Amino acid sequence: GLSGLDSTNAAAAKGPIVDKKVRNNPEGWQRKACWNPVIYQIPGGDLVIYFKIGNKVADWTGWMVRSKDGGKTWSKREPLKEGFLGPIKNKPILRNGRLIAPTSIEEGGWRLYFEYSDDMGKTWKRTEYVKADEGVKAIQPAIMVLKDGRLAAVARTRSEHIGITYSSDNGETWSKLELIDTPNNNSGLDAVTLKDGRHVLICNDRPIPKGIKNGKGLRTPLSVMVSDDGVNWRHWITLEDSPISQYSYPSIIQTSDGKLHCIYTWRRQRIKHVVLDINKMKD
């Protein structure tokens, strides 16, 4: 039910380095890292990559590049509107003519919010922060479309379980964050709604072990799970399971042929690509 392909290396996985002149820097120039690239094909439009620039998360600014020829050539980088970061880790979705980008901030406490555009990405608005119980911190949401028409977003948390929030107005407002039964060890995840209405989640489905000081568990195993409602998840397949290292920051999409494509960091050395056949998915 799966095939795999290793590609590139850890250095390439970090993305390009952008040189920016910094005032009062005696050397004149300072190298700034690019973070969390998100590539997205706007239906009927450009192929875009959203990313962040900054030496630390608190200094992030949002940027993008675009391609009009399927990725062969790219524009110069463009800054996003001040105060907007774009999708923070996971892909946007297009729903009823609206692009909705899942995002979050870490400065001043982990908080989810969403940015949305009604003109295919030309201009953007943003939501309020998603409310949560005291002590529940969440980042890096992934959006699903439920069968009843609502949107749901699952998110990484520090609370040993995946968080979920809902929208009934196409992404303008979101419900208070709830914790579901599926474990999360403070590691990135992604989700996608399939053409048949089911949802698929890729994540490290283990709780944070007791006694861990930094609040992060081992990012292994890496599992793929399936759900009918976005809340109750069934294990489908384990992609990786080794204590040697970690398998992290996964992304998942469904292509036009129905196949699922998973990409993730393999032991902090390479990027791995795995293709899954949903026809072999057992209910």
Language model: regions and residue ranges:
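Asp-box/BNR beta-propeller blade signature and adjacent active/binding-site loops
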Residues: 1-283
